[in-house]
């Protein structure tokens, strides 16, 4: 039977798929739209399963504040081009809205949005991954996003402007802890052993090496903690100095950056696409 433009339009509206894909699906089902949708969903799931092996290290960090807390979400794709795509961002924001409404776990988010994710993978042609969701509590919260790639929320006792500036500092300086005293003992001991070994390799006697390491460890714990770092807006002062001057404090912070911790392959996505086109041409 002949497939009409109205049928193709209806299938496109309901699935978001391309015109040629819709026409092909309708032709295969003799114009049965419901069967075409079922077949496209099955095909989409298969395509998504194949894409799942592709590394998704680009994407976006999104933030949404609720009553006394904030949610930070990372959703990944394969290229920065798709990271700016309206369909990708709409999906990410939909996930964030659900997460922020009731502090949903990452496992439940993945399960709830799996069908939508699969449909998006089919439409966009890249692997999409809802990677992580973090929550931070606090009566006073300030957030900062550096583009779509870095997101920070800071909780503390301070005015909004001060907390916003601290959030900007966290985005730039990547502290791991709030205070030097928060650095775990095992981290301190590991660094201390390393510094002693370095000092002794420099030819220093053991007792001298031990004394040298005291100063180095103070520097180390300061560099990895927020209040011990030089404040980016006033480098001659530490963040701790600034907070003390303002009678303020920071209780917690969360910093997320797109793709951190994901091992990337050397080959780029463009090369992968070229290889797929070449394989198609040979077929």
UniProtKB/Swiss-Prot annotation:
Listed transmembrane segments: none
Cellular component, GO annotation: cytoplasm
Family annotation (Pfam families): EF_TS
Organism: Shewanella halifaxensis (strain HAW-EB4)
CDD domains: UBA_EF-Ts (cd14275)
Molecular-function GO term, any one: translation elongation factor activity
Region Involved in Mg(2+) ion dislocation from EF-Tu, annotated ranges: 79-82
SUPFAM superfamilies associated with the record: Elongation factor Ts (EF-Ts), dimerisation domain, UBA-like
Protein localization: Cytoplasm
Taxonomic path: Bacteria, Pseudomonadati, Pseudomonadota, Gammaproteobacteria, Alteromonadales
Function: Associates with the EF-Tu.GDP complex and induces the exchange of GDP to GTP. It remains bound to the aminoacyl-tRNA.EF-Tu.GTP complex up to the GTP hydrolysis stage on the ribosome.
Family: Belongs to the EF-Ts family.
Protein name: Elongation factor Ts
Keywords in alphabetical order: Cytoplasm, Elongation factor, Protein biosynthesis
Annotated coiled-coil segments of the chain: none
């Amino acid at each position: 039977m002949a497939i009409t433009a109205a049928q193709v339009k209806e299938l496109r509206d309901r699935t978001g798929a391309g015109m040629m894909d819709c026409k092909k699906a309708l032709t295969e089902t003799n114009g049965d739209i419901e069967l075409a949708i079922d077949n496209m969903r099955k095909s989409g799931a298969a395509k998504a399963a194949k894409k799942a092996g592709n590394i998704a290290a680009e994407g976006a960090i999104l933030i949404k504040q609720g009553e006394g807390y904030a949610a930070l979400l990372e959703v990944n794709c394969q290229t920065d081009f798709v990271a700016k795509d309206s369909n990708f961002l709409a999906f990410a924001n939909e996930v964030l809205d659900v997460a922020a409404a009731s502090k949903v776990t990452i496992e439940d988010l993945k399960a709830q949005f799996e069908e939508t994710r699969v449909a998006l993978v089919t439409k966009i042609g890249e692997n999409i991954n809802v990677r992580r969701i973090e929550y931070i509590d606090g009566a006073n919260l300030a957030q900062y996003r550096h583009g779509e790639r870095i997101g920070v929320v800071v909780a503390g006792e301070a005015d909004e402007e001060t907390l916003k500036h601290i959030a900007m500092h966290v985005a730039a300086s990547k502290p791991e802890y709030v205070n030097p005293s928060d650095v775990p003992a095992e981290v301190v001991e590991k660094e201390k052993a390393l510094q002693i070994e370095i000092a002794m390799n420099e030819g220093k006697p053991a007792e001298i090496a031990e004394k040298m390491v005291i100063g180095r460890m103070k520097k180390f714990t300061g560099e990895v903690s927020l209040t011990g770092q030089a404040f980016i807006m006033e480098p001659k002062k530490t963040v701790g100095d600034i907070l003390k001057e303002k009678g303020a404090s920071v209780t917690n912070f969360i910093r997320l950056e797109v793709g951190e911790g994901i091992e990337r392959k050397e080959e780029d996505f463009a090369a992968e696409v070229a290889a797929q086109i070449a394989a198609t041409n040979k077929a």
